[in-house]
Amino acid sequence: MSIQTQEAHDMSLKSLSLIATHSHIVGLGLDENLQPKPSSQGMVGQLQARRAAGVILKMVQNGTIAGRAVLVAGPPSTGKTALAMGLSQSLGADVPFTAMAGSEIFSLELSKTEALTQAFRKSIGVKIKEDTELIEGEVVEIQIDRSITGGHKQGKLTIKTTDMETIYELGNKMIDGLTKEKVLAGDVISIDKACGKITKLGRSFARSRDYDAMGPDTKFVQCPEGELQKRKSVVHTVSLHEIDVINSRTQGFLALFTGDTGEIRSEVRDQINTKVAEWKEEGKAEIVPGVLFIDEVHMLDIECFSFINRALEDEFAPIVIMATNRGISKTRGTNYKSPHGLPLDLLDRSIIITTQNYSEQEIKTILSIRSQEEEVELTEDALDLLTKIGGETSLRYSSNLIAVSQQIAQKRKSSSVDVQDVKRAYLLFLDSTRSAKYLQEYESRYIDDHGRVDISTTGRNADAMDTNE
């Protein structure tokens, strides 16, 4: 079987920068000795958990250990997802990191095991080394002869380095490529001999005085030295899932962009595993074990946990990091209770990292970082009030009040958020504790699980209206 690999192009909008919940986190905030700093790279507090995550980080970077399960357990609003996001940022772009929620695998289009298999294989990278022949030089002259009848075009390309000069015959494809890239005499270009791809490297310094005015994107480079034809080693990094999709159907690479991958047959994956193992032995490829992060892992059922147990023992297995805020609770699909809602055999395979509640000073530091990220100017008194609210309710609720308070402050034409803005936002939007208290007080006015509601208490006056004339 001939395995095809193509680099997946990121089609996301790079210029679109939105402020998300964890957009202020750029790393784990560790020094060179893996010791956590009190506040660094957007991470605050949780020193023991961050130190443990630093050890996991080194395990992944070394690439020698895979197939390990890590459970991050702690109460709500203690930074479990933030810890995983910090780990993702510290790993960089070369190490695959796949994040998903526990409920994402339940789909009508894919089975649970297929969704988990795809997530596992997205987290395993393959670095494929390829030697390519390139022609690099400065364009001296381009001659293109076009037929009057609109037939085949012919042309000649004169290209040089500081040591030699050569003339190449051009066909239709190369002429179209040069026209598309708008290559002119004096440009320094690179041509891939295998596929005919033309890359414009810049403009030669010798032609810097040809024009009086040039665009801001014009880049001047030196004329290449030595031979025109050079061998260059290129490393392509793709995931096993991308190779699966490309080889699963005739136009499989299109599914990388549409997301319509469907069920991939196990025979295809087995052949790809065999081929990748051959490439690894021959030195053509290198396996990069990545990280699979499953948030709200207690939402998985017993069949999924059984699959994860088996998948962790596979040859191509990433490090699986799971997060949960459950205590002693039922495992989905069973009638028995277990710690964190996970079966005991998976807990036995996992190393567990615990997170603690934030202190008042740590909450204040986090809210200060969030206000800077959202470009909201808070007065010292407003920050103290938000810190107090965060300690009594939750950190999420307090951080959500920042943007709301800014809108209230803008309404009164103020550039900074004051205490009165925070108080008004606090009164307008209830937290979970006040909402639960309100429900208990007016429970009879709400519809219960059986569809019943006490109609006699829904109005302000419980007395019946007199309709007699």
From Swiss-Prot:
Q: Quote the subcellular location field of this record.
A: Nucleus
Q: Which domain of life is it from?
A: Eukaryota
Q: Name one GO cellular component term.
A: Ino80 complex
Q: Which Pfam families does this one have?
A: TIP49, TIP49_C
One GO MF term = 3'-5' DNA helicase activity
Q: Where does ATP bind?
A: G74, P75, P76, S77, T78, G79, K80, T81
Keyword Isomerase listed? The answer is no
Keywords linked to the UniProt accession? Activator, ATP-binding, Chromatin regulator, DNA damage, DNA repair, Helicase, Hydrolase, Nucleotide-binding, Nucleus, rRNA processing, Transcription, Transcription regulation
The biological processes this protein is annotated with in GO are: box C/D snoRNP assembly; chromatin remodeling; DNA repair; regulation of transcription by RNA polymerase II; rRNA processing
Tell me the InterPro entries matching this sequence: AAA+_ATPase, P-loop_NTPase, RuvB-like, RuvB-like_C, RuvBL1/2_DNA/RNA_bd_dom, TIP49_P-loop
Q: Which Gene3D superfamilies match?
A: 1.10.8.60, P-loop containing nucleotide triphosphate hydrolases (3.40.50.300), RuvB-like helicase, domain II (2.40.50.360)
Q: What is its EC number?
A: 3.6.4.12
Which reactions are catalysed by this chain? ATP + H2O = ADP + phosphate + H(+)
- Which EC class does it fall in? hydrolase
Annotated function? DNA helicase which participates in several chromatin remodeling complexes, including the SWR1 and the INO80 complexes. The SWR1 complex mediates the ATP-dependent exchange of histone H2A for the H2A variant HZT1 leading to transcriptional regulation of selected genes by chromatin remodeling. The INO80 complex remodels chromatin by shifting nucleosomes and is involved in DNA repair. Also involved in pre-rRNA processing.
Assembly, per entry: May form heterododecamers with RVB1. Component of the SWR1 chromatin remodeling complex, the INO80 chromatin remodeling complex, and of the R2TP complex.
Family statement? Belongs to the RuvB family.
Q: Cross-referenced PANTHER family, in alphabetical order? A: RUVB-RELATED REPTIN AND PONTIN
Q: Write the protein's name.
A: RuvB-like helicase 2
